[in-house]
Swiss-Prot record:
(R)-pantoate binds at residues 61, 154. Its EC number is 6.3.2.1. GO terms for molecular function: ATP binding; pantoate-beta-alanine ligase activity. It comes from Leptospira biflexa serovar Patoc (strain Patoc 1 / ATCC 23582 / Paris). It is an enzyme of class 6 (ligase). This is Pantothenate synthetase. Beta-alanine binds at residue 61. It is found in: Cytoplasm. The reaction proceeds by a bi uni uni bi ping pong mechanism. One of its GO terms (cellular component) is cytosol. It catalyses: (R)-pantoate + beta-alanine + ATP = (R)-pantothenate + AMP + diphosphate + H(+). Its main location: cytoplasm. ATP binds at residues 30-37, 148-151, 185-188.
Amino acid sequence: MIVVSEIADLKTIISEWKQNQETIGFCPTMGTLHDGHMDLVKTSKGQCTKTIVSIFINPTQFNDPKDFDAYPKNTESDLKLCEEHGVDLVFLPSVEVIYPKSQTPIQMSIPSLQTTLCGRTRPGHFEGVLQIVSKLFHLTEPNYGFFGLKDYQQYRIISAMVEELNFPIKILGVPTKRESDGLAMSSRNLRLSPKDRETASLIPRMFQLAKKTLLGGEKNLIVWKEILTDFLLTGSNVKIDYLEIVDPITLQPLSNLNGELLLATAVFVGEVRLIDNEVLVSP
């Protein structure tokens, strides 16, 4: 496995791979890797001849400096995990390499996809995501980009950017990897106290309740949302950032329970913000 931190070294390797007609898969991460990230790697290795993982905690997508400072860093174990799973190259740049002071900052946005869900409560977050992902796409020149569907809004926004700006990249969403109790895998789970970790299991149980009530014939969106909200709030130390029912493509709020829908939530359990979602079908 190759580990590089400089753009020039990365470009040299990419150039060689392109000359050899390798198919390149790219998995951008912020480190503290877990089995969910490794599912991205496995999917890439099944699709591509070379797999790149980037590890970069991007400061421009944090609207809360405390959140950035608290973000866990485990570079040594991350590299070991990548090597064990057959990653070909890890790009491990510094902030100075990605955002040199000589550059003029550019801001990107897709307003129609950023006004709901996390975009409503985290101003500037997706501008930062689009900025770093577009940079990394240009640097790694992949044929495929792999993104976890736990961050569904991010997946949709990046897919739209690639389509709108004609990036020669195919974006693939990888299903959410879950813990044994159904909680979506996330580096943030490490910050939960034992009691809060138990409380967090309300989130996957809420999705089970959502399916059960839909199959039971619930058709009133307002009533359905109230049922799910009340269930989440049975947990101590829980604060709901949002619980929304939106169109899976446009991410705009729905007014009724007909056909395919995206149920998405962000919940604070203690000080830790957890997100999850599921695409459901109302019969």
